Design a protein with these regions (language model features):
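Short glycine-centered segments of the SAM/dcSAM-binding site in methyltransferase folds
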Residues: 45, 140-142
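A short glycine-rich, Lys/Arg-flanked "PGG" loop and its adjoining helix->strand segment in the class I
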Residues: 127-139
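Residues lining the SAM
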Residues: 113-115
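Class I SAM-dependent methyltransferase SAM/SAH-binding core
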Residues: 57-100
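Conserved class I S-adenosyl-L-methionine
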Residues: 1-41, 43-52, 142-158
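A short acidic, Gly/Pro-enriched loop at the edge of an enzyme's catalytic core
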Residues: 102-109
């Protein structure tokens, strides 16, 4: 049985609410911040784990980074590809479950942003995701994990 976050219909219905105009407008600043705090240089590689619609992936690519986005929902990846094409940037997009994701490619930085973590039914599954992301990093690579507190979620989503 699929978990709720694996259901494509959920994301099709929820995405317009979760990713309103304000969320899209902040994406360039978020990407700049990621590049800055991870000390990334042009041409460095970034894994966007749980990239969804590509909101941040596209902006990171626009900053001359090589971006690979991974998501479990194919329609989200299709939307990310459309956004990348519209902005004239390249993304590598992979349809995969982060619980089983593995890459022979190693990244300078990995990000998991904006409520893309903590969906799994068990802590063990969440830890597997963290390990898989960590294992995808080059030695000395940076992992940026954004977690939303209960208070923040209540403020934004109620």
């Amino acid at each position: 049985m699929k978990q709720w976050f694996e259901e494509e219909d959920f994301w099709i219905n929820y995405a317009p609410i979760m990713f309103d105009d304000a969320r899209w407008a902040e994406a360039p600043d978020v990407a700049e911040y990621v590049k800055s705090i991870a000390n990334l240089k042009d041409g460095d590689s970034v894994l966007d784990a749980g990239c969804g619609l590509g909101r941040i992936s596209v902006e990171l690519a626009a900053l001359n980074l090589k971006v690979t986005g991974v998501d479990i929902i194919q329609s989200e990846l299709d939307a990310a590809a459309e956004s990348a094409a519209a902005e004239g940037v390249e993304l590598e997009l992979i349809n995969a479950d982060l619980r089983t994701f593995s890459s022979s490619k190693k990244f300078d930085c990995a990000v998991n942003l904006y409520t893309s973590f903590g969906y799994c039914a068990t802590e063990e599954e969440d830890l597997i995701i963290i390990k898989n992301i960590f294992d995808s990093l080059k030695d000395g690579g940076t992992f940026i994990l954004e977690c939303v507190s209960r208070e923040t979620a209540i403020m934004y989503f109620t």
